[in-house]
Amino acid sequence: MSTDFDRIYYNQSKLGGRFRLAEGGLGWKASATGGSASTQNNEPLLLAADEVSSVQWSRGCRGYELKISTKNKGLIQMDGFQQEDFNLLKNDFQRRFNMQLEHREHSLRGWNWGKLDLARNEMVFSLNGKPTFEIPYTHINNTNLTAKNEIALEFDTQNEAYNPAGDELVEMRLYVPGTVEENEDQDQIMVKDEAEAEDGVKSEVKTEEGSEEPDVQEEKTLAEYFYEELRSKADIGEISGDAIISFQDLFFTTPRGRYDIDIYKNSIRLRGKTYEYKLQHRQINRIFSLPKADDIHYLMVLSIDPPIRQGQTSYPFLVLQFQKDEETEVQLNVEDDEFEKLYKDKLKKQYDAKTHIVLSHVLKGLTGRRVIVPGEYKSKYDQCAVSCSYKVNEGHLYPLDNAFLFLTKPTLYIPFQDIAAVNISRAGQTSTSARTFDLEVVMRANRGTTTFANISKEEQQLLETFLRSKNLRVKNEDKEAEQRLQTAFGSDSDDDDVDINMGSAGEDEESVDEDFHASDEDDDVAEEFDSEASASDSEGETSKSERPSKKAKLE
């Protein structure tokens, strides 16, 4: 007869389920909640009795937790038990599996240093014999030596079998001081956490007994030793011989450097001199293959989500640069039977072509993403991009069939479906700005604007025509200003009907001010102070009489 427990959470899942202990093993199944899609994603767990290695009981997030260490399937966590369930579980494991249920208490002192035990399925950080926290190896996605004595651990946030509720940790750094001499006893190593570096208090790292130690040929830092040991335990660094295909010394503009690329069945690893990155195929959303405007290089852009990280910097785009005529000859590292079964319709057995074409074809086959290439747009100089600047960065804007792509730093991708309008304007009236214009992209849902400046005026008509062909709303501020000016001056009417208000300069006939009456006193004053006043008046009358009369205005 089996023993059941309800409202138990498997590996910190969002949904509870039923946990069952039986003679042949144990299992878990998510509770049905109206047939929701989230329930369907939680596959039932079945574990044979001979697969269980050890079991532990401790406090958890939702009560008490049962931690099951397996021989080949990593670590299993069952959370949500009540305190009174301990005796029942202890008796069941003893009776059914002949196994002791170990009760472990966590250290709650809050110290950031202690002993680090690289156990079979998890990394345990403990203080005074009590664990402070545990990290299963399956949750560690990558590790890097960020400094001489510093190691960064990056956690896997894309594991489909791990669905935590709420926020989760994405990175942790450890400070590991000291060095290792040749033939030095490696059983206990001093290490401390990054945040404790100022305290000067050291802790220890302890490796599992019987683990194979690497041959030390020269002095190395404890950080290097710990880094290699962790990679071995967590299987972070796949064996290069298992890679389906590899490319050597490829140049990346983002993140900048040269990296070797090893492509595996479900993941890709970038190996540089200082940093290594690992990304799953499912992280790649888009693949772009574009010629650079210098006609010498070719660019390949990978849009990835979630982005890879380097400290506080995240990289949502990976940008590779190739020589345009660079060629590669490579063969897939798979057996013929495996190729016929898995890759025949996706890849070629052997490649001999330009490097960017080979890499794009391989990525397309393994990820299932299509390769986006330049569309129908051509600039005045028959290129697929226009030179411009974004803020203080100069680059090139690629008008693709369905989006804008700005390269290279920062890389910006703006789908046309997210654009509300495009404004074309000049930044000023100087001689320099008269030869260029700005392209302002207004996003939908009040998500702000993005401005690409200093685009050559020669490209305006071609770019405007292209955008209108994509059913985008284009607003030319210069043309609208000119139309408003013409409307203000009535330029749309015939010349004969134009009657522009020009003030007194436009009067055709003289008008008499009826309110003004000249007096004799004015004449007397003129004669008194100007002896030629009368002569001037008479001359004025003479000249006035000699002036030709104006022609009558034709109606």
UniProtKB/Swiss-Prot annotation:
User: What subcellular locations does the record give?
Assistant: Nucleus; Chromosome
Q: One Pfam family for this entry, by name?
A: Rttp106-like_middle
Give residue spans, biased composition: Basic and acidic residues.
194-209, 541-555
Which SMART domains does this entry report, sorted A to Z?
A: Rtt106
Supply one GO BP term.
DNA replication
Q: Which Gene3D superfamilies match?
A: 2.30.29.150, Pleckstrin-homology domain (PH domain)/Phosphotyrosine-binding domain (PTB), Structure-specific recognition protein (SSRP1)
Provide ranges: composition bias, Acidic residues: 520-531
Q: Where are the transmembrane segments?
A: none
Tell me which UniProt keywords the record has, alphabetically. Answer: Chromosome, DNA damage, DNA repair, DNA replication, Nucleus, Transcription, Transcription regulation
Q: What is its main location?
A: nucleus
* Function per UniProt: Component of the FACT complex, a general chromatin factor that acts to reorganize nucleosomes. The FACT complex is involved in multiple processes that require DNA as a template such as mRNA elongation, DNA replication and DNA repair. During transcription elongation the FACT complex acts as a histone chaperone that both destabilizes and restores nucleosomal structure.
* Miscellaneous field: In contrast to the orthologous protein in animals and plants, this protein does not contain a HMG box DNA-binding domain. This function may instead be provided by the HMG box of the associated NHP6 protein in the FACT complex of fungi.
Q: Could you give the subunit structure recorded for this chain?
A: Forms a stable heterodimer with SPT16. The SPT16-POB3 dimer weakly associates with multiple molecules of NHP6 to form the FACT complex.
Q: Which named protein is this? A: FACT complex subunit POB3
Q: Which organism is it from?
A: Kluyveromyces lactis (strain ATCC 8585 / CBS 2359 / DSM 70799 / NBRC 1267 / NRRL Y-1140 / WM37)
State the gene name recorded for this protein. POB3
